[in-house]
């Protein structure tokens, strides 16, 4: 599902950017940043930085009612957030163009904070990170810095729907004398 979400978002971003820049091969793609120094796709690259568990929803009980007084022991869904980086990966001679592309990408993020993939709604927002954290991220990605923004995609839910036990709740008490 992570691939579908990032691919869909990159496709929507590419469609938006194509209004301003006319490139038949497109301007947004999902990919690794800093994978090779000689590789400069001259595009806005959408890359996964981190997956984190969403904890604000609280802890759900593993017992779920499934109807007719029956219950099932099911693990609650895993709620996740995706931290992504949107980086304008251009060669040095096109630095000004990369800044323009980053500005247009931020306009897209601001104008489209919600999107739907396969019937599930997601939100995206920019994340503030310190200069030190940004430096650490770029060091992990290979050391080459590109103009970029870090965003968080919220509300990814992974549910295996595995039932570990089932049974019935008691109905009317039966008293034998």
What is each residue range found by the language model?
Residues 71-77, 94, 140-142:
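Short, solvent-exposed beta-strand/turn "edge" segments of beta-rich domains on protein surfaces
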Residues 60-65, 96-104, 120-121:
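"Short basic amphipathic alpha-helical interaction patches in structured regions
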Residues 74-91, 103, 146-155:
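Oligomerization/assembly interface segments of phage tail-like spikes and tubes
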Residues 55-86:
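A broadly used, surface-exposed interaction patch
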Residues 69-77, 166-177:
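Short, cationic low-complexity segments
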Residues 1, 81-83, 91-94, 101-107, ...:
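Long protein-protein interaction modules used by eukaryotic assembly/scaffold proteins
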Residues 100, 106-161:
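Acidic-leaning, charged glycine-interspersed low-complexity segments
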Residues 1-64:
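Small/polar-rich, solvent-exposed N-terminal microdomains that initiate assembly or binding
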């Amino acid at each position: 599902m992570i691939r579908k979400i990032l691919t869909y978002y990159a496709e929507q971003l590419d469609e938006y950017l194509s209004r301003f820049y006319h490139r038949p091969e497109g301007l947004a793609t999902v990919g690794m940043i800093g994978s090779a120094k000689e590789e400069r796709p001259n595009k806005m690259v959408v890359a996964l930085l981190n997956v984190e568990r969403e904890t604000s929803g609280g802890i759900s009980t593993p017992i779920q009612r499934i109807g007719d007084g029956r219950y099932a022991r099911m693990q609650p869904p895993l709620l996740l957030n995706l931290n992504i980086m949107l980086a304008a990966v251009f060669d040095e001679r096109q630095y000004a163009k990369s800044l323009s592309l980053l500005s247009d990408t931020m306009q897209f993020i601001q104008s489209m904070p919600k999107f739907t993939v396969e019937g599930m709604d997601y939100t995206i927002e920019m994340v503030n990170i310190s200069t030190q954290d940004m430096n650490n991220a770029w060091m992990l990605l290979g050391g080459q810095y590109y103009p970029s923004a870090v965003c968080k995609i919220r509300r990814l839910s992974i549910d295996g729907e595995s039932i570990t036990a089932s049974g019935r709740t008691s109905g009317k008490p039966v008293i034998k004398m």
